[in-house]
């Protein structure tokens, strides 16, 4: 049977150890996959599925060339798969029986080291999560490509999900005992690959990495991470930096849904960077600066001192335009130091990459000189503590040529004069080749054959080639025939064979010695890992700061003043993304005034008028302020927010089977549970996913709860105009609206937010813009006129006497049918028809998904039957 062959037995034994990975099994010049791996890989990679054996014993198989395997591996990694690379670890010539094979590494989405397989300006974090007996969670994360490692602790599962969303997590390693339901939720919410690791003891030799960590829980979490890395990578992790502890109250908390709603690092629909806040503020010119910027955007600060330190740096760079522009030019020539250092430690850096390291380090003196000219005392003091690695530059300048090949096994890497023995071999090789050229001329003169030439191939070595017409001119007995061609003969002489041996031996010695010397140089570079990492961190921060200064100058941002009180005062605020994507000069700036008595702004106004943009604008300005960037406004005074919560837009959670309304309620619940008076809450159209009266009741109850219990700064947009009466009942509620005017039957949206309530929603007009049939919109106009002319839903006349509680709006009982009188011969509207019309008028067309629209239509249809 095919499965019983020695080779297949070997395959099955190795595959049993890597059941959750594709096993790339090296056979000659190919990586082969067998059985289920082959069937699945052929489908995913769109390659031919063949077989081994015949009939029922035929084993499915497919393969990829080893020299182009990276392309196929990257495609599988993008889909979240793991790949075990199994190589031949002995020379087939020396093998007794089946060639010995071993898995030399396990490549997973969180352990990629090849720069071609990862995004340049994104981290590639592997995360280990340990669930403890008290249901708290320890989180350890590391980027194998840069060496960065961090740990944190959260108290419950919802917080775990939101914490993981704050980093570029590609793979999560779980402790044993997770339910399939919880694991599925994690996989679906974050689109990550899941793995498992039982061991959690800190491996010996790595204790020094944890000097900043004291909590046993965090040591267990980091131990699990290291155990997984050592098991999968099968090599030392000496480039991992000392682990940093992230205390729970040092960064602004932004939950997973809010990150997506605000489009912090990617757009909601297309999942692209362009159109996100990160895109709007990214003026970095190095890969490592881009990664640090993304981390800052994902984790805004709470420390006023640190925020103002960053602001001071931005101001210094803003005040020195020419030095900043020169600095940008210098930084453009700096390669990715962090990932180059990672490859040095990992042992897979090549000569060309070490030259990139050298060229980067050669730029450091000019970079530091420009920064010193800018004159910020804080950064200049830090520059004095940075090792510029000048001795490393000297080593790399003397050892490596300027343009070495990518391969480290072909020679051509080491500079002349670096090693005496190598120079000796090179002299022999070069002089030997000169001797060959001289011999060719000498043979031509001796034989009189002008076309005689000396050539070389790998089969016969050096040879003398003579055309058949000139063979008679050769001296008999001196030339030994080696090969016959159609029109020529090839010969060797004793003299030529002797010189050939000398030349070829020298060239083989050169290649081997260069390889050995390169490994020695690479090993010496490892001694500089820590100073190189510190240097890379400094360069990264300088790049982010100059980027903030550049974007602030280009787009006229201002330095926000941080308030000790909770007041918000923004003059001429703008949405940093929207103002960039609309035609120049068309963006309408808006003020935000949220002092005492205005902690909750109740926003009404037409669809398409810009309510959602206004709400997001405030959140993004707050986040920009707390990462240290200047903000898009004429003037800004801001408090420091501990958390931001948003519920904006509507989209069914199809993966979990949850409706829009359920998702809306879950997100609102999380905000109401977690928010403090120092938080910012944005709620858009809460309650629209249920019936009118249920929705209004919920909306009012939520506003009252925020007002009385949380007291957080809140923007609450609604189409329930009845809620505007709350301004008279709740001391911190203020009505504002987005204005619009009608001109000759056309509605003009002014996009300006002003005090007071809106008089109309213009839902039917927006329906016309959306292209609904005229017969539908005309009928809606008629019905709306009847409703407005007959009777409106009003607040109950009943008031609660002798109490300080605010009056409740009576939203639950419709007026009796008799109150509505028909016009002409038309039948009076039923309660259901009134409810449907009210709902139709309230629909936000632009932010309603096709699925939600179908659901609403079905709901209205059921009511009207």
UniProtKB/Swiss-Prot annotation:
Binding-site residues for ATP, renumbered to this chain: 605-612
CDD domains linked: ABC_MutS1
Span list, region Disordered: 814-833
InterPro entries reported for this sequence: DNA_mismatch_repair_MutS, DNA_mismatch_repair_MutS-lik_N, DNA_mismatch_repair_MutS/MSH, DNA_mismatch_repair_MutS_C, DNA_mismatch_repair_MutS_clamp, DNA_mismatch_repair_MutS_core, DNA_mismatch_repair_MutS_N, DNA_mismatch_repair_MutS_sf
Cellular-component GO terms for this entry: cytosol
Any one GO MF annotation of this record: ATP binding
Keyword ATP-binding belongs to the record: yes
SUPFAM superfamilies: DNA repair protein MutS, domain I, DNA repair protein MutS, domain II, DNA repair protein MutS, domain III, P-loop containing nucleoside triphosphate hydrolases
Role description: This protein is involved in the repair of mismatches in DNA. It is possible that it carries out the mismatch recognition step. This protein has a weak ATPase activity.
Homology family: Belongs to the DNA mismatch repair MutS family.
Name of this protein: DNA mismatch repair protein MutS
UniProt source species: Halalkalibacterium halodurans (strain ATCC BAA-125 / DSM 18197 / FERM 7344 / JCM 9153 / C-125)
């Amino acid at each position: 049977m095919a499965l019983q062959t020695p080779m297949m037995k070997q395959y099955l034994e190795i595959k049993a150890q890597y059941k959750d990975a594709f096993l790339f099994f090296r056979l000659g010049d190919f990586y082969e996959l067998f059985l289920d791996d082959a069937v699945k890989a052929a489908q995913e990679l769109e390659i031919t599925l063949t077989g081994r054996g015949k009939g029922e014993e035929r084993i499915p198989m497919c393969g990829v060339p080893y020299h182009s395997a990276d392309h196929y591996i990257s495609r599988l990694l993008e889909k979240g798969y793991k790949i075990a690379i199994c190589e031949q670890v002995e020379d087939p010539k020396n093998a007794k029986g089946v060639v010995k094979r071993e898995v030399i590494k396990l490549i997973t989405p969180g352990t990629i080291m090849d720069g071609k397989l990862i995004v340049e300006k994104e981290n590639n974090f592997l995360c280990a999560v340990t669930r403890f007996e008290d249901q708290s969670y320890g989180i350890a994360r590391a980027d194998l490509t840069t060496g960065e490692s961090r740990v944190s602790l959260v108290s419950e599962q919802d917080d775990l999900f939101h914490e993981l969303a704050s980093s570029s997590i590609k793979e999560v390693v779980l402790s044993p005992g997770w339910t399939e339901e919880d694991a599925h939720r994690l996989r679906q919410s974050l689109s990550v690959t899941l793995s498992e690791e039982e061991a959690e003891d800190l491996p010996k030799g790595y204790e020094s990495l944890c000097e900043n960590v004291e909590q046993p829980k965090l040591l267990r979490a980091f131990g699990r991470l290291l155990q997984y890395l050592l098991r999968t990578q099968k090599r030392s992790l000496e480039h991992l930096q000392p682990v940093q502890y992230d205390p729970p109250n040092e960064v602004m908390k932004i939950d997973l849904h809010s990150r997506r709603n605000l489009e912090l690092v990617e757009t909601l629909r297309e999942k692209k960077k362009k159109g996100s806040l990160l895109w709007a503020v990214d003026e970095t010119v190095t890969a490592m600066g881009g990664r640090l910027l993304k981390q800052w955007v994902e984790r805004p600060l709470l420390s006023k001192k640190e925020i103002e330190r960053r602001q001071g740096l931005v101001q210094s760079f803003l005040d020195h335009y020419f030095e900043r522009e020169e600095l940008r030019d210098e930084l453009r020539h700096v390669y990715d130091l962090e990932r180059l250092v990672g490859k040095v430690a990992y042992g897979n850096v090549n000569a060309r990459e070490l030259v990139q390291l050298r060229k980067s380090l050669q730029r450091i003196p000019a970079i530091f000189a420009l920064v010193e000219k800018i004159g910020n005392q804080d950064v200049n003091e830090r520059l004095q503590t940075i090792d510029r690695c000048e001795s490393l530059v000297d080593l790399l300048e003397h050892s490596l040529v300027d343009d070495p090949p990518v391969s480290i096994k072909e020679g051509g890497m080491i500079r002349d004069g670096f090693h005496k023995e190598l120079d000796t071999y090179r002299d022999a090789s070069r002089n030997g080749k000169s001797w060959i050229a001289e011999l060719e001329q000498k043979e031509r003169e001796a034989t009189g054959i002008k076309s005689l030439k000396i050539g070389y191939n790998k089969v016969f070595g050096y040879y003398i080639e003579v055309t058949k017409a000139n063979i008679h001119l050769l001296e008999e007995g001196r030339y030994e025939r080696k090969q016959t061609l159609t029109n020529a003969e090839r010969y060797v002489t004793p003299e030529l064979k002797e010189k050939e041996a000398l030349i070829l031996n020298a060239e083989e010695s050169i290649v081997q010695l260069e390889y050995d010397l390169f490994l020695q140089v690479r090993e010496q570079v490892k001694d500089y890992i820590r100073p190189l990492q510190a240097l890379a961190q400094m360069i990264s921060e300088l790049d982010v700061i100059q980027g903030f200064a550049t974007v602030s100058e280009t787009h006229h941002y201002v330095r926000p003043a941080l308030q000790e009180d909770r007041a918000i005062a923004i003059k001429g605020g703008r949405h940093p993304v929207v103002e960039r994507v609309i035609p120049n000069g068309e963006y309408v700036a808006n003020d935000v005034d949220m002092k005492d008595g205005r902690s909750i702004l109740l926003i009404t106004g037409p669809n398409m008028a810009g309510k959602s943009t206004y709400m997001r604008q405030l959140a993004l300005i707050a986040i920009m302020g707390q990462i240290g960037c200047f903000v898009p406004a004429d003037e800004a005074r801001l408090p420091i927010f501990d958390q931001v919560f948003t519920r904006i837009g509507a989209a069914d959670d199809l993966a979990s089977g949850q409706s829009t309304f359920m998702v809306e309620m879950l997100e609102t619940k999380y905000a109401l549970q977690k928010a403090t008076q120092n938080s910012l809450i944005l709620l858009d159209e809460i309650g629209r996913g249920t019936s009118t009266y249920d929705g209004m009741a919920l909306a009012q109850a939520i506003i009252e709860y925020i007002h009385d219990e949380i007291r957080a700064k809140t923007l609450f947009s609604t189409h329930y105009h009845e809620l505007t009466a709350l301004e008279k009942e709740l001391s911190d509620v203020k009505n504002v609206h987005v204005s619009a005017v009608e001109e000759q039957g056309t509605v003009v949206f002014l996009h300006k937010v002003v005090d007071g309530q809106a008089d109309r929603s213009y839902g039917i007009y927006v329906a016309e813009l959306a292209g609904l049939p005229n017969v539908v919109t005309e009928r809606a106009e008629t019905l709306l006129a009847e409703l407005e002319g007959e009777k409106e839903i009003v607040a109950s006349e009943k008031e609660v006497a002798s109490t300080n509680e605010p009056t409740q709006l009576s939203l639950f009982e419709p007026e009796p049918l008799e109150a509505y009188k028909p016009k002409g011969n038309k039948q009076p509207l039923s309660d259901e028809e009134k409810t449907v019309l009210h709902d139709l008028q309230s629909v936000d067309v632009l932010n309603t998904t096709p699925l939600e629209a179908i659901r609403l239509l079905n709901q209205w249809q059921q009511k009207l039957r």
